[in-house]
């Protein structure tokens, strides 16, 4: 059993509530637009970090974190990238990868819109955790934690905070 925290689009901002929400997870998975290497290091010093770079990340972050990441945890094959779309609206190159690699879990960011959708056609769970940072057009700061037990995804919880609340 593995407890994971899933986030994206921090854009150099780590709100204090993030650390409390993720305090009991085993790993953090960041789907890009980290912002800078200091943000990545802060996350990696807090919990083991798996991450991909995003379109706003500089060369230092890009040298440390790949564009695409494939890995296996429990009995689940995971594919993570920053820009990729969602069921019925995948980017062509991502759709090709999903059809060829057949991951059980596909994670992306970029849109700043939280989505958790099961794709019946490709038999995978798609997660976009939304935006964990405060830069962008989104109205809510969001991120996710869940448990992976064998091939089962369970105990999924969403953190959501109105950006205008200024309680961070």
Whereabouts are the PLM-identified features?
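Beta-strand-turn-beta hairpins that frame and shape the catalytic cleft
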Residues: 1-5, 70-79, 119-125, 148-157
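N-terminal active-site segment of His-dependent metallophosphoesterases
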Residues: 1-49, 57-70, 75, 139-142, ...
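Active-site neighborhood of phospho(di)ester-bond hydrolases with catalytic His/Asp-centered motifs
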Residues: 6-8, 27-33, 50-55, 79-82, ...
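Residue-level detector of flexible, active-site-proximal loop/helix-junction positions
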Residues: 11, 87, 133, 150, ...
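Conserved beta-sheet core of the metallophosphoesterase superfamily
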Residues: 50, 89-152
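Helix-adjacent hinge/juxtasegments
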Residues: 50-100
């Amino acid at each position: 059993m593995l407890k994971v925290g899933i986030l994206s689009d921090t854009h150099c901002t780590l709100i204090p509530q993030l650390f409390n929400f993720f305090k009991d997870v085993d790993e953090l998975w960041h789907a890009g637009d980290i912002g800078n290497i200091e943000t990545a290091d802060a996350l990696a010093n807090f919990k083991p970090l798996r991450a991909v770079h995003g379109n706003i990340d500089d060369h230092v972050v890009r040298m440390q974190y790949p564009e695409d990441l494939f890995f296996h945890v429990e009995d689940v094959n995971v594919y993570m990238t920053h820009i990729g779309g969602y069921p019925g609206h995948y980017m062509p190159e991502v759709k090709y990868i999903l059809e060829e690699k057949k991951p059980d879990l596909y994670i992306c960011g970029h849109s700043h819109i939280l989505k958790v959708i099961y794709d019946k056609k490709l038999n995978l769970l798609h997660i976009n955790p939304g935006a964990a940072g405060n830069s962008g057009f989104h109205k809510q700061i969001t991120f996710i934690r869940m448990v992976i037990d064998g091939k089962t995804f369970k105990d999924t919880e969403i953190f959501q905070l109105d950006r205008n609340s200024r309680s961070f």
